[in-house]
Amino acid sequence: MDWTEKYRPTTLSEVRGNDKARDALKKWAETWDDHREAVILYGSPGIGKTSAAHALANDMEWPTIELNASDSRTKDVINRVAGEAAKSGTLTAGGGGRRLVIMDEADNIHGNADRGGARAITALVKEASQPMILIANEYYEMSNGLRNNCQDIEFRDVSPRSIVPVLRDLCRQEGVEYESDALQELAEQNSGGLRGAVKDLQAIAETTERLTADDVVTGERDTTEGIFEYLDVVLKEAGAQDALEASYDVDETPDDLINWIEDNMPKDYEGTELVRAYEFLSNADQWLGRVRETQNYSFWRYAGDNMTAGVAAARDGTKGGWTRYGPPSYWSKLGRSKGTRNTRDYVAQQIAAIDGVSMRTARREIMPFLATMTHHCRNRELTVAMAATYDMEAEHVSFVTGSGKDTNKVQDIVADAEALKEEAAVEHSGGVFEGASANGGDGDSDADGDAPDTDAGEESGDQQVTLAADDGAESDATSDGTTTDDETETASEAAEDDDQQSGLSDFM
């Protein structure tokens, strides 16, 4: 079990490293009847904002309603879920009839995925008759209207002096032997982030019987310079063992490091060595998936072996020259303009709706996977299938693949995706669009191949599927119910072909 969850504070008195913010939050709660204002908790990730909010709820005996980034946060959802909770109390014995509404990542409400959400939150904090806590990393990413109608409390980065006692307590709780210097090194490396220090401690503790300073990467490191030097070592110079040892000096988790390597590897590798390297990256990705599923961080070791030693071993000798390495294109796009965030959120919403996963899973797991599989549209057939499945326009395909949206390549892919959707709507809808029934009929309906019309605006691609399926069902109801052998064989072949080329949800 993840130690950050296992040992999450249950009362405010257990929250470490932000005494001033903790006291201010307690005062806000105790005087809420006097001011009736929402409060914004803001600061860097991993420093205890969400934990403090839940600990406060326990102290005040307030039931909680939480809406986070993994949920759809449109105007309707906010009004239905958070709105009802914020305007009505509870009949439970404790807490004075109050309930606490917690909205995580309140600074990350953008675009189609959360349409109207920001305005709905602003209206809600003005009208709420129950206490509300908004949690944000970037205070000024929220609108002026929202900030002006809330109190605010800043959570500062946690100092190493406050982190060390927490790590010491965890070691005692888990029966881990340790050297004091090792805990100090961990705290300094994660200065500012208590959650990161705890995760690092768990990862190391699960791979050794006694935690020593040698187990901890020493020295303060510059992440950007370190990663570029490391890429030079792995992709050009080092053998397998040296590449593995070099990874210990890079301030990146395996989840992040694999993206750096994958995005820059094709700049130095080609042909069979690139194929071999991708096989090692695939193995590493499987081990990382097991970490996410089991929370067993000892599997990080095997992921690291594959993505570092394996990738280095796949190379045919050393390489010279200078290479312009860069951050993973998928990451770099995430921090750009609001328009890019809108594009990202549309893609995430489509994935979430069609694959039946949360927005968080769509953003953090499936989108990076798609970006890798369709990088620069090299696998054209798969890219067309992706665009058809998730109803993508040129800007969406460009965002995921890293190719320019105005290029002929992307435009042709979008056109082929439209043709694939039209064909699926006429012949069958079980392949490209999972869950829809076959669109039958008497052969005369939709003979021109046009897809059924959908409402403009907020209707997404999955609504298009529903309409196509409904039309087919209605047509079936009016037909004579007979089907020829040729028609059955054709439909079967089409479904089989479609399963092979566009069943993204299946193989994911």
UniProtKB/Swiss-Prot annotation:
ATP binds at residues 43-50. Signal peptide: none annotated. The keyword ATP-binding applies. CDD domains: AAA, HLD_clamp_RFC. One of its GO terms (molecular function) is ATP hydrolysis activity. Residues 443-461, 483-500 have a biased composition (Acidic residues). InterPro entries: AAA+_ATPase (IPR003593), ATPase_AAA_core (IPR003959), P-loop_NTPase (IPR027417), Rep_factor-C_lsu (IPR023935), RFC_lid (IPR047854). Residues 425-508 are annotated as: Disordered. SMART domains: AAA. The keyword ATP-binding applies. Coiled coil: none annotated. One of its GO terms (biological process) is DNA replication. Keywords: ATP-binding, DNA replication, Nucleotide-binding. SUPFAM superfamilies: P-loop containing nucleoside triphosphate hydrolases. Belongs to the activator 1 small subunits family. RfcL subfamily. NCBIfam families: PRK04195.1-4 (NF003228), PRK04195.1-5 (NF003229), PRK04195.2-1 (NF003231). Heteromultimer composed of small subunits (RfcS) and large subunits (RfcL). Part of the RFC clamp loader complex which loads the PCNA sliding clamp onto DNA. This is Replication factor C large subunit. It comes from Haloarcula marismortui (strain ATCC 43049 / DSM 3752 / JCM 8966 / VKM B-1809) (Halobacterium marismortui). The lineage of its organism: Archaea, Methanobacteriati, Methanobacteriota, Stenosarchaea group, Halobacteria.
